[in-house]
């Protein structure tokens, strides 16, 4: 089992991403509001105020999607994400990382 974590920079793609996951039979995910460290530093700490100029055009908030998936769905899920947001090699399209999950508690283990 794998945990796919996707930090979505463009919130307007959220519904389309979730629909793409459903087409792959990925039926569960948790969506969190998230903010990058640079945004916080630029807003709240005067010494880092120069970050504001560097971050013009970037979004202050993101959506972070967490979903547990079988290993055979990792590459199809990444491909589905890229079909919606564009290449993840391009800055600003988002960030995906995959973690191994050894044990799961609190949900059905048959999915």
Task: Please describe what each predicted stretch is.
Residues 1-111:
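Positively charged, small/polar-rich N-terminal and surface patches that mediate targeting and assembly
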């Amino acid at each position: 089992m794998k945990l796919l974590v996707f930090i979505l920079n463009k919130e307007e793609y959220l519904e389309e991403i979730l629909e793409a996951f459903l087409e792959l039979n990925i039926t569960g995910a948790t969506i969190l509001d998230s903010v990058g460290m640079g945004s916080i530093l630029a807003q709240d700490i005067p010494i880092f105020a120069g970050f504001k100029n560097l971050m013009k055009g970037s979004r202050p908030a993101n959506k972070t999607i967490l979903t547990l998936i079988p290993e055979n769905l990792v590459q199809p899920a990444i491909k589905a994400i890229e079909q919606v947001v564009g290449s993840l090699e391009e800055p600003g399209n988002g960030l995906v990382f995959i973690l191994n999950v050894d044990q799961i508690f609190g949900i059905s283990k048959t999915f």
